[in-house]
């Protein structure tokens, strides 16, 4: 480093030197320091070039690349990804699009369609580490992986470390799919659900002796007091105004949540596949379009695994034998795993739910068993009938509970009623909505006009 500083001083003007020194100061990656030492001449040549001046200095790019991103050899390794981050290299630009999804606009359903029906890999941002560098590295490795032919990037929150740098390393001219929804519906989603369910405080594995009513208790909805946190809403649910300034707004396509409802989703995905050049939904995956993503709280219950074992048959829990002898030592080795999960495609497993129940719950979940295990369990009629009886009772109660939850859950009308009773909040949220929806109003006034409850809110504001 002692020899590096004089070289930088002699070969870069103070402004360019500060760019390089700031990057070194921001990193704790020894491999980055070594790279700079070994390639300092190339770095200085690039920083002094007219191309660097015209592309990055004149545009006041906050994180300009320290080497020419057009002439580098890279791969899908973690090493290259971390080095690229420290060098401020933009992410490779061959992702199909960026999907901006404020909390509550149907992102879970849309991402399911992309990943499972259209062969587009797009990780839900809320499942990635809450660190912009880690997200950048994950995307960088995937975009350099030759085995991944269709990739998209999801952004659904803004309150993560180094997020400004992350955004600056995305292409300004990226194609954008921006999820939107009647903001009263967004508030209903945020205020009306018990988000403590996300913590999943229940065992994920059980056996035939387990009292499944504990899961039913978890699924049971409890109305909670509305707690308004404006900062939290603006970091997760009303994020468009802060995000879109980082991109070319002419490249933004607005996707109203209504267009991915169960009746419209298939046509919408076919249309988007043509517009954004990705694989349209496969015919064999059409059952996935019948899923209601947020039906009660089953989204947060599954997956759970029943380990079915003949040794537990005589102590199986039923509603009429609640004081059965519980087996707290589940034998995973000699048991057959039966997985309760949301509906999905897995060629290695068989979904046996329709051997257990025949109602609309079959659209939203499956009961999965390995093909080899299915052949085994069919040979053991007593075990198979016990599994089906145990799960039939369990699934029956699941349906009752989630249907009751749906009926009790907050509705858009309840949000409007809340504003009528708390008029002091109307002006605050009017300003939030105006800021959030300013570009949408210019580009897609038809979407705004279709929002029944937002327009009711405007009438409240107007008095």
Label for each model-derived stretch:
Residues 109, 113, 239-242, 271, ...:
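Amphipathic alpha-helical segments that form well-ordered structural scaffolds
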Residues 1-90, 278-463:
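PAPS-dependent sulfotransferases, especially Golgi type II membrane carbohydrate sulfotransferases
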Residues 3-6, 10, 17-19, 23-285, 291-362, 367, 449, ...:
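PAPS-dependent sulfotransferase catalytic domain
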């Amino acid at each position: 480093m002692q020899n590096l500083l004089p070289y930088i001083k002699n070969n870069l003007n103070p402004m360019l030197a500060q760019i390089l020194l700031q990057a070194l100061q921001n990193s704790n990656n020894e491999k980055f320091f070594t790279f700079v030492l070994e390639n300092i001449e190339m770095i200085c040549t690039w920083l002094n070039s007219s191309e660097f001046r015209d592309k990055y200095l004149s545009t006041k790019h906050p994180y300009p690349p320290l080497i020419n991103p057009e002439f580098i050899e890279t791969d899908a390794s973690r090493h290259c990804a971390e080095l690229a981050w420290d060098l401020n290299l933009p992410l490779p630009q061959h992702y199909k699009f960026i999907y901006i999804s404020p909390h509550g606009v149907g992102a879970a359903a849309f991402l399911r369609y992309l990943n499972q029906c259209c062969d587009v890999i797009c990780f839900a941002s809320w499942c990635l580490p809450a660190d912009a560098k880690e997200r950048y590295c994950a995307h960088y490795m995937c975009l350099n992986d030759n085995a991944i032919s269709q990739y998209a990037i999801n952004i659904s929150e803004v309150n993560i470390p180094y997020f400004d740098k992350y955004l600056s390393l995305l292409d300004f001219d990226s194609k954008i799919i921006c999820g939107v929804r009647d903001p009263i519906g967004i508030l209903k989603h945020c205020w009306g659900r018990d988000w403590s369910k996300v913590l999943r405080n229940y065992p994920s594995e059980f056996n035939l002796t387990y009292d499944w009513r504990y899961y039913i208790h978890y699924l049971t909805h409890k109305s909670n007091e509305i707690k308004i946190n404006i900062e939290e809403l603006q970091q997760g649910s009303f994020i468009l105004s802060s995000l879109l300034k980082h991109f070319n707004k002419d490249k933004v396509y607005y996707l109203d949540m209504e267009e991915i409802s169960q009746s419209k989703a298939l046509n919408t995905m076919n249309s988007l596949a043509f517009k954004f050049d990705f694989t349209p939904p496969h015919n064999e995956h059409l059952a996935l379009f019948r899923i209601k993503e947020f039906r009660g709280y089953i989204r947060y219950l599954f997956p759970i695994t029943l380990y079915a074992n003949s040794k537990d048959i005589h102590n199986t829990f039923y509603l009429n034998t609640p004081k059965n002898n519980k087996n707290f030592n589940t034998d995973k080795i000699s048991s057959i795993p039966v997985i309760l999960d949301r509906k999905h495609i897995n060629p290695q497993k068989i979904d046996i739910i329709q051997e257990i129940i025949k109602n609309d719950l079959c659209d939203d979940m499956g009961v999965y068993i390995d093909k080899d295990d299915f052949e085994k369990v069919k040979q053991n009629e007593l075990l198979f009938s016990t599994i089906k009886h145990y799960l039939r009772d369990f699934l029956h109660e699941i349906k009752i509970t989630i249907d009751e939850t749906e009926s009790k859950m907050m509705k858009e009308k309840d949000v409007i009623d809340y504003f009528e009773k708390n008029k002091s909040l109307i002006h605050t949220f009017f300003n939030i909505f105006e800021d959030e929806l300013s570009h949408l109003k210019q580009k897609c006034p038809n979407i705004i006009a279709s929002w029944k409850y937002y327009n009711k809110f405007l009438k409240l504001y107007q008095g």
